[in-house]
Amino acid sequence: MSLKKTLLNIKAFAFDIDGVATDGSVFCSSDGDLLRTYDAKDGFAIRMAVMHGYPVAVITGGSSESIRKRMVTSGVKPDDVYLHCRDKREQFKQFTEKYGLSPEQVMYFGDDVPDVDVLKAAGCGVCPADACLEASEAADLMTDAPGGKGCLREAIEKTLRLQGKWVFDPVQYKAKF
């Protein structure tokens, strides 16, 4: 199937955090919380997807509740933020079943070895420009942007534009967020 047809079939998005939504850097605060930085443009793309009815999930090995807090501010439902994942296939399956989706209808973003099986299972596996070799070989699409620097925005925007849904409605946006 061509990339265009694949993107037209996408009905949901799921992604890893470290190395995808962030650049992979983790800072440890004096109280032991693990802190990350996120690109606001990625957050806006997530909000656009949510605003247009796409389910969005986070499937990460990270375990900090600050991840959930950040993703909820971007519109992700709290119970669609899967933390402390060791076999991401399990949470990917839970997510697809919850929304009645086939794996082929989900775009999954991953950057490292623990993401490879889900990158292969998803309808469109996406990796950032700085992904490891195994992830880049498993992905259907590599973004020009590296992790934490707009890779989510790049592929989500591309998909929504192709589907005619990259449309900003300030009234709807204000009501939702």
Residue ranges and their predicted role:
Residues 1-90:
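Alpha-helical substrate-recognition element adjacent to the catalytic core
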Residues 32-36, 74, 78-82, 89-177:
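Mg2+-dependent phosphoryl-transfer enzymes with acidic/Ser/Thr/Gly-rich catalytic loops
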